[in-house]
Amino acid sequence: MGDTRAAATELGYIFTFLLGVLLMSMFSVWAWDIETNTRLRWNEEAIQANMDDIAAAVERADEASRFGGNISYAEEIAWRPTEADESLFWLELHDTELVLIDEGGPLDTTVSLSGTGAGTHEGRVPLAGVERLWVVHDDGMTFLSLDRPQAVQ
């Protein structure tokens, strides 16, 4: 009789242990999923904020270009870092849109521009290791640059 109770108690311990392992595993997967989704959301929000800042600078450059004459304009924009692989990011400026190309993932982003400047827009810059970039309007063209323009120094 004593052996049966001892065996039942041992089986209870084993099942309780296995239930604990199962619950801890489920919690770990759940916590990992929350962390991954949070990181992805933060990346998307940082990229969107960066794109909005650059688009606003392009609009200000367009406004300056409409003053006519030989207007030069330059504005520095700080690039917010993300946890994405930015070595695969390219930023393209077109007349009516700013495009972020993510060659290695799902973070491609487009921001519309008014395109009301007196000149054209063009430029493609890599974002690998970039901490800041410049929106420049010079000689009738608005473009992106990683280097500080000479006229601004």
Mark where each language-model region is.
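Glycine-centered recognition micro-motifs in short, flexible terminal segments and loops
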Residues: 1-18
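Alpha-helical hydrophobic helix detector
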Residues: 17-29
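N-terminal export/assembly leader peptides and their processing motifs that target proteins to secretory
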Residues: 29-153
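Short, flexible segments with low predicted structural confidence
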Residues: 2, 25-26, 33
